[in-house]
Amino acid sequence: MCSSDLGNGLENVVLYLSEGYSGPATLSTTVPVFDQKNCMYTPHVLAMDVGQNFDVKTSDQTTHNIHPLPNPMTGNIPWNQSQPPGAAPVEKSWKAEEVIPVQCNIHPWMHGWFVVVKGPYATTDDSGNYTINNVPPGNYTVTAWQEEYGKQTQKVTVAAGGAGSANFTFKAK
């Protein structure tokens, strides 16, 4: 569970194994989709694995512009692409782990995030709940990232045939 110190569950928190996981990226069998709908990015935060293809599409009847701003030192390359109504989805992937802000240069209120990780991860639902699946037994550091509150970490042990648990409380600003 991820919540604020006011007791509210936090949506759009990305949780991932930042230490202890040495396996491969856990590429999903479904392609993550970042949609431009009602002049908002949906989901607001899109988590994915390093090297995983994802699609950017538009459901709006207006032209949008998708402009991720990765740190060039990571090896991820910024891009800036217009997407008119009815355009085919744009397929992309990222080379390195990073939290990447996304903006629309046409509609300045539109912003979102790509969170690129290696290994098992989860994003909280609207109540702050999450489950990280496919975690082998071992000792890990779980990192929770939220766009306003930043990062927190916790040590977690997953026993053979068992599950680990980590609850995060972020101090409201």
Regions found by a protein language model. Name each.
Residues 19-49, 53-57, 88-92, 158-173:
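Extracellular beta-sheet/turn segments enriched in Thr/Pro/Gly and aliphatic residues
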Residues 79, 89-91, 121, 127-134:
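Short, surface-exposed beta-strand/beta-hairpin micro-motifs centered on an aromatic residue
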Residues 83, 116-124, 149-166, 173:
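Structured interaction patches on ligand/partner-binding surfaces of diverse proteins
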Residues 7-10, 48-50, 94-96, 132-139:
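Short Pro-Gly-centered beta-turn/loop motif in secreted/extracellular proteins
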Residues 99-101, 108-123:
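A structural signal for beta-strand and strand-to-loop patches characteristic of beta-rich domains
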Residues 1-3:
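Short, small-residue-biased leader/transition segments that mark boundaries at the very start
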